[in-house]
Design a protein with these regions (language model features):
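N-terminal [4Fe-4S]-dependent radical SAM core
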Residues: 67-138
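Conserved alpha-helical substructure of the radical SAM core
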Residues: 158-186
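Catalytic cores of alpha/beta
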Residues: 266-267, 331-348
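N-terminal pre-triad scaffold of radical SAM enzymes
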Residues: 124-153, 186, 360
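Glycine-rich beta-alpha loop elements in corrinoid/cobalamin-binding modules
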Residues: 2-88, 95-96, 372-373
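Conserved SAM/AdoMet-binding glycine-rich loop
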Residues: 175-324, 328-332
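Conserved, mostly hydrophobic/aromatic
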Residues: 1, 110, 145, 170, ...
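Short acidic, glycine/serine/threonine-rich loops at helix termini
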Residues: 15-17, 150-154, 192, 198-203, ...
Length: 374
């Protein structure tokens, strides 16, 4: 068996080429971004041997060590092959290092394929998929995220190195969108996991990968972090200028701590003036600094500084636009007192949330590891 993990475009091509050349599936053990199983103990001197499944299933300490090793091996530049034994089945699970990030040209090629831009006809009988309305007229401009929130698995799926499409690729897709019969002039979103990440966190990442034991934004922005929204500003200006486009919104996650630390306010100002559809949703997640530390999020004072400036810019531009915070309850490490503080914060805002996010464990996140191990 062979599994492609992460964003598998390059892996799929390499697997197909191997099959076309006559290599049996069982011998395709060399493709990055894949996992395979074998009954023979792999002869891989540089591989990291993880504790066997039987051991991590019964020992939280060994599970913690295994997860940490996996987490440190998610970067394509530094990751090693991981081997996990399954003694009960006489098998070994082998995970090859992740694929290298796609280049801009490769990203453009992926998004230039003739997608139907619709759900499969089989869903018609069930009334379709309502969620498609939100993404049908949206543009995916980037991939990856160096935010590294504890409750998010993006580090495992897309990695911490930002990959972007070219302006022309996005403009061409936008032109295609404007030709859709039900297009009303509104591009709903231009973003990705984090909308305002359009470049790697620093130049080092392109040659050496992301730091293994240091985050880009937490607990404080790294001194090497390059904060620059100029490319995103230029892209949004071009999209706004397209014929048939009335408004271009940014609705996917804006990383407010990255934004508020940009000394150039051009993007912040244009975001408020042109790209908010009545309310801007951001994710402070909590108000207790103790919980935020567990989440890998900035201190609450950073969000308050952002919210204050957002309010000031709206007043300056004579706009009445709301700021809607995403908040999470029950995160590991949260106490009853923390929950009360969160409730009091909502009371102070006079805000009754329509949607509530209560933590639940999901695979491949630090928060789930905390939840399970205590």
């Amino acid at each position: 068996d062979l599994i492609s993990y992460g964003m598998g475009e390059r892996s799929i091509v390499e697997i197909a080429e191997a099959l076309r050349s006559g290599i049996p599936v069982r011998d395709i053990t060399f493709v990055r971004g894949t996992v395979y199983k074998t009954a023979v103990q792999p002869d891989l001197p540089d591989a990291i041997r993880l504790p066997g499944f039987d051991k991590i299933a019964t020992s939280k300490e060994l599970y913690a060590k295994s997860f940490y090793r996996q987490y440190l091996n998610t970067d394509p530049f530094t990751a090693k092959t991981l081997v996990e034994p399954y003694p009960a089945d006489n098998l070994f699970l082998v995970q090859n290092p992740p694929q290298k990030p796609l280049s801009t040209e490769e990203m453009d090629a992926v998004y230039a394929l003739p997608y139907a831009r619709a759900y499969h006809p089989d869903y018609e009988a069930a009334g379709g998929i309502p969620a498609i309305e939100e993404i049908k007229f949206s543009l995916a401009s980037c991939r990856g995220c160096f935010g590294a929130c504890s409750f998010c698995a993006l580090t495992f799926h897309q990695g911490r190195i930002i990959q972007t499409r070219s302006h022309e690729s996005l403009l061409e897709e936008a032109r295609q969108i404007t030709q859709e019969p039900d297009f009303k002039g509104y591009i709903h979103d231009v973003g990705g996991p984090t909308a305002n990440f359009r470049q790697p966190a620093c130049k080092k990442q392109l040659q050496h990968g992301a730091c293994q034991k240091r985050q880009c934004l937490f607990p404080e922005p790294c001194p090497n972090l390059e904060i620059d929204h100029s490319d995103y500003v230029a892209l949004l200006r071009k999209l706004r200028a397209l014929p048939k486009v009335k408004r271009v919104f940014v609705r996917s996650g804006i990383r407010f701590d990255y934004l508020i630390n940009d000394k150039d306010e051009t993007f912040f100002r244009e975001l408020v003036r042109y790209h908010v559809s009545g309310q801007l949703k951001v994710a402070p997640e909590h108000v207790s600094d103790g919980v935020l530390r567990m989440m890998g999020k900035p201190q609450n004072s950073v969000y308050r500084r952002f919210a204050k400036r957002y309010k000031e810019l709206n007043a300056e531009m004579h706009l009445d636009q709301y700021l809607v915070p995403y908040l999470m309850s029950s995160h590991p490490g949260s106490t009853l007192q923390d929950a009360i503080r969160l409730a009091e914060y909502l009371r102070e805002l006079g805000y009754m949330p329509e949607q509530v996010q209560d933590f639940y464990p999901t695979p491949s996140t630090i928060s789930t590891f905390m939840y399970y191990t205590g």
